[in-house]
UniProtKB/Swiss-Prot annotation:
The gene is plsY. One of its GO terms (biological process) is phospholipid biosynthetic process. Pathway: Lipid metabolism; phospholipid metabolism. This is Glycerol-3-phosphate acyltransferase. GO terms for molecular function: acyl-phosphate glycerol-3-phosphate acyltransferase activity. Catalyzes the transfer of an acyl group from acyl-phosphate (acyl-PO(4)) to glycerol-3-phosphate (G3P) to form lysophosphatidic acid (LPA). This enzyme utilizes acyl-phosphate as fatty acyl donor, but not acyl-CoA or acyl-ACP. The lineage of its organism: Bacteria, Bacillati, Cyanobacteriota, Cyanophyceae, Synechococcales. One of its GO terms (cellular component) is plasma membrane. Probably interacts with PlsX. PANTHER family: GLYCEROL-3-PHOSPHATE ACYLTRANSFERASE-RELATED, INNER MEMBRANE PROTEIN YGIH.
Length: 204
């Protein structure tokens, strides 16, 4: 009983701490001497790093943020926790990325970390979701729109992956991750509706 409870709590704490690693903030601070929270969109994610620092740092931040989500799930799996706790660890990583304790609870928008979580939980769903993101991005050149559409597609992708028999925890995380990503993009939605959302290559 104690070992089981300890493992569950450990997975949540590690998930949050992994997610809260401020890779974008650190990259901008070390390479450009700026506080990313005070530049552009104010997000500490890869898109704002791209606009404020450059392509190379943005790619590195993206890969690190993906790794945070995947690692959180894999740690829970290594602890032999059930699907529900693996999912919870992934969501803890998303929460850490969005609300990092180190940065006054102001972080990123959980897109890359959410992708990493999906790759850890069900890699076909993660790849399909990323494919939708890239497809929309290739036509629109708007990262936020691509992220929102990919997030909205997630529950359907999860249902299709398991042919209507998705594990309850997986279906729950699909809806939870969708809600978190869309909620974090609410200011982007306002700009999209107003026609003022910047495209790739434009400053925010």
């Amino acid at each position: 009983m104690f070992n089981s409870l300890f493992g569950n709590l450990l997975s949540l704490v590690m998930g949050y701490l992994l997610g809260s690693l401020p890779s974008g903030y650190l990259a901008a601070h070390w390479l450009a001497g700026i506080d990313l929270r005070e530049k552009g969109s104010g997000s500490t994610g890869a898109t704002n790093v791209l606009r404020q620092v450059g392509k190379g740092p943005a790619l590195a931040v993206f890969l690190i943020d993906v790794g945070k989500g995947t690692t959180a799930v894999l740690v829970a799996r290594a602890l032999e926790l059930d699907d529900g706790w693996q999912v919870a660890a992934g969501l803890a990583a998303l929460a850490g990325h969005i609300w990092p304790v180190w940065l006054g609870w102001k972080g990123g928008k959980a897109v890359a970390t959410g992708l990493g979580m999906l790759l850890g939980i069900s890699w076909p769903v993660g790849l399909a979701c990323f494919g939708i993101f890239l497809t929309v991005l290739s036509f629109s050149r708007i990262v936020s729109l691509s992220s929102i559409i990919a997030a909205l597609s997630l529950p359907l992708l999860m249902i299709l992956r398991f042919q209507g028999n998705s594990p309850p925890a997986y279906l729950a995380v699909a809806f939870a991750a969708m809600a978190m990503v869309v909620w974090r993009h609410r200011s982007n939605l306002q700009r999209l509706l107003a026609g003022t959302e910047p495209r790739l290559g434009q400053s925010s």
